[in-house]
Amino acid sequence: MRELVSEAEVVAASGDDDLVVWAAQGMRSGVRAWACGDAVAVASPEASRRDRLVVRGTASQVVALVRHALAECGPSYRPLGDAQLIERVVEAAPELELAGHFSWMGTEKLAPPRGEATSPGMTGTGVTGLEGAASWLADSAAPEVAALLAAANPGSYAVPGLPRVRRWAGVRDGSGGLLAVAADAWSAPTVGLLAGVATAAPARGRGLGERVCRFVASALIAEHGRAALMVDDWNRAAVGVYERLGFARRRVAAAGLPA
């Protein structure tokens, strides 16, 4: 077992796995990582509002890394990785329990908009439509964003004012009302994270969520090289939007020590 001390070491040990590299967060202060054989574990504090222990590799070696990382970093860290791997880890480590399944989705290139030709200039500078372009919102829009999230996505991990929730984009109606939002939040140097997606209930079904997500994802790819997100498996409508945008789905699971 060896400790990894740089992002380059994490990239090499993980084969540039986007989930693992995202968790490394550029090896910012507080992040720790280890490798054992083909297994890698990255302990990332407050990554999308959770202390996450992202893992990959052979289950037996991952179990050893998980136990070491939990001893080093504390019981708040939740192992996260491919669903089958986490299920095997829980079977082999009876002190852990399965916390839930969801999906990680990522892409390096967006699919062309439906019914439109690919636009080489579409790199986060605006996506037009009847309700207006998706665009970055001023900091002064934070109360509007918070109100829309409270009504349309109260479980959102990204909310205005949280550390590393960097910026918000939105779509407004003709009178200036905010209809849809999405955030650039907890992004890593080479993996941008899309979060905080919400559309006002009366405006749903008009493609506004897809529009604002395309805008943010395009900007993330331009800046970081790839974009990713987390989505609940039950939210089939959201999964469909992300797949239309060109995101590939990866089923993951989380585990943890009993409270």
Regions found by a protein language model. Name each.
Residues 1-21, 101-104, 108-156:
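Short amphipathic alpha-helix that is part of the acyltransferase structural core
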Residues 1-90:
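N-terminal charged segments
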Residues 39-40, 176-180, 237:
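Glycine-rich acetyl-CoA-binding "A-motif" of GNAT/NAT acetyltransferases
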Residues 60-117, 126-136:
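Hydrophobic alpha-helical segments and helix pairs
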Residues 60-69, 199, 205-221, 239-244:
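Conserved acetyl-CoA-binding loop-helix of GNAT-fold acetyltransferases
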Residues 84-96, 210, 233-252, 259:
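Conserved active-site alpha-helix within GNAT-family acetyltransferase domains
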Residues 157-198:
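A conserved beta-strand-loop-helix scaffold within acyl/acetyltransferase catalytic domains
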Residues 227-231:
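Conserved hydrophobic beta-strand within the GNAT/NAT acetyltransferase core sheet
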